[in-house]
């Protein structure tokens, strides 16, 4: 089977490397960045390149698996551009961390039977093909979501992909996915950016000289790809706003406790410590 990866960034590049390492599948890639393609070819991370996406309509790529591994908004545009392959022998999946906008496109096209949504829960604050790894997905969870219209053979091909990368498959519907990740991933990144904004206001003070490991770890998320996270914040706006409202309410509760009732803050922090130990 041929696997065509669209987008050779951290995720796409890592999929390619791990497939080359673990399987005998033929791995091809398309990327608008010729340097990324050249590096992947020179490093034997892919077997060949795709010059343009129209090539994928040829018989040469029948029964292949296409993995869209670009930032979320670009993924939506690419998916639309591949509409001629909907309901074909080609299997299409993605890696986006937002699912409902993708699902809406599928419904718009009468729910094609060959498209399965994927979200590997793996990554790094370092982006780009140059930071890709041949073990990024090892032992990591991957969310897989398929509409009822999808044929079982296409689901199996996507499952084979993630099993080849030694990932753990979890099935989850798009609505639940976007709600959960607004809290578990998108909000923490937003808070990291907010802390950095606060530090920017204090740039006359060299805070980093007086910081411990937790400080750097907290800010690490803000080193992630601005393009990708701008897309995520925008596309998951409703869920993120709800999560952010709750977060702000809790910040205000902590602020009030600090100012008005020092004993209460101790009790609150103790209960939160217990909750964390029992759940996370």
Give the location of each predicted region:
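NAD(P)+-binding Rossmann beta1-loop-alpha1 motif at the extreme N-terminus of oxidoreductases
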Residues: 1-61, 65
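Residues at the starts of beta-strands that form the adenosine-phosphate
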Residues: 2, 26, 114, 141, ...
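Short beta->alpha hinge that forms the Motif I/post-I loop of the SAM-binding pocket
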Residues: 32-33, 70, 95
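Rossmann-like NAD(P)-binding element
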Residues: 54-86, 90-91
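Short secondary-structure boundary/capping segments
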Residues: 58, 107, 133-135
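Rossmann-like NAD(P)(H) cofactor-binding subdomain of soluble oxidoreductases
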Residues: 76-130
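Internal alpha-helical scaffold of NAD(P)-dependent oxidoreductase catalytic cores
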Residues: 134-220
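Interdomain hinge/lid region at the active-site interface
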Residues: 205-272
